[in-house]
């Protein structure tokens, strides 16, 4: 598929929803996936797009397919 250079794409995620559903703190999730709490905050706010490796670690932590957590819009 070809994309226009003018096309603005963003990633939406369900990290906050899944974390709350699981009763985990930002610190607990951060420790589980090997990042800082500030990184989790930025991901949840949509201010930071995680690397593929981090997205996969988050998906594994929540036992969800990565595409159920992160969506290209």
What does each model-found stretch correspond to?
Residues 1-9, 16, 21:
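N-terminal flexible/basic segments that precede or flank functional cores
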Residues 32, 43, 72:
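Residues in the recognition helix of alpha-helical DNA-binding motifs
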Residues 35-48:
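Recognition helix of helix-turn-helix/homeodomain-like DNA-binding domains
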């Amino acid at each position: 598929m070809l994309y226009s250079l003018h096309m603005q794409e963003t990633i939406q995620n369900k990290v906050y929803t899944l974390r709350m559903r699981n009763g985990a703190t930002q610190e607990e999730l951060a420790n589980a996936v090997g990042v800082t709490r500030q990184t989790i905050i930025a991901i949840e706010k949509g201010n930071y797009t995680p690397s593929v490796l981090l997205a996969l670690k988050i998906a594994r932590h929540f036992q969800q397919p990565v595409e159920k957590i992160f969506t290209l819009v």
